[in-house]
């Protein structure tokens, strides 16, 4: 497999979208068109957009970028990487922006045709924000397995999504996950899981595996409307929920807790 390097570090989404600033896109376009035929894109970006101005619109702008790329190059799959942690940006007010970006990346793979995502939240960094060389090897393996499974229909390894959250009672919710994956939390402890309602944020204390899901209990009763977050902070807990094949559960932010026939993931 040949990879055409067009990456630029420390960039904003707007720099890759022809509908916005687009500077990096046009440089990429020149290089890509010189190569002739190609099969798809690898995308790992988002840290710079973890801010008040850009985070809330990331999903819509990413969707527009994908449409623009399809118009320019024809339809090609885009293999993406959900953001890893940042240990150098610990201002609590920034946590929500990291959650918004990670959730936009999760939603993109669920809602945009040809977009796929793998997790990186469990991997080591070199300086608190950049993935280590060992982490990049694992990311490459996950991307290759995703391509085999999603694009080529061959044995690989798929990512695990929180698809929806349902209320059971005022201290328990059911998370509906990608079918066919048994997800386990260490000692059934709900590290990095929170429910947010009109009274604020509450920690989740237990996550018990069931078929295609988790039963999560909260540290206090919650009120509806409420939303579920997982591994959403800039630097979430290091113990992450994983499936039986050691694939981490993708992070999510702001999933509405609602009855099954009303469930949405926003």
Task: List the predicted regions and their residue ranges.
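Cell-envelope and extracellular/periplasmic
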Residues: 1-266
